[in-house]
Swiss-Prot record:
Organism encoding this protein: Arabidopsis thaliana (Mouse-ear cress)
Protein name: 14.7 kDa heat shock protein
Record-linked InterPro entries: A-crystallin/Hsp20_dom, HSP14.7/HSP23.5/HSP23.6-like, HSP20-like_chaperone
Gene3D superfamilies: 2.60.40.790
Record keyword Cytoplasm present: yes
Residue ranges, compositional bias (Polar residues): 1-11
Residue intervals of the sHSP domain: 22-131
Signal peptide: none
Keyword vocabulary terms for this entry: Cytoplasm, Stress response
Subunit structure: May form oligomeric structures.
Amino acid sequence: MSRNMEVNAGSSGEIPSPIRNRFQKSGSQAVYEVTETKKSCVTRVDMPGCPESDLTYWVDANNVHFFADEPAMPEYENAGRKYGGSMIFNPEAYDVKKTKVKLINGVLWITVPKIPGKNASINVKERILHY
């Protein structure tokens, strides 16, 4: 499995390490995971607090773009978190036009089917988008 990351790093040019969720008792600590099945590439992105009704996504060439906002809670002086990014897939190995996207209980699932007969190894690039 290969992951390439393109982000706007801070002034030091270094990418900050993710902070471990001390309240999480089991499971992966990663904010996102990319896995391969026999028929597809499945990406899991944690977007806690975001309702499915707020998800916006679209497919553009070999890119899958997504955005969602956690609702603001003024009574707790919380403006809500905003999430968004793009996943770039190899168009020679994946049928990106047939991508399926679901947001279930604050977890975004992006499923991109493999093109039959093509040797697809996971080489997905992600981009963090700021809007």
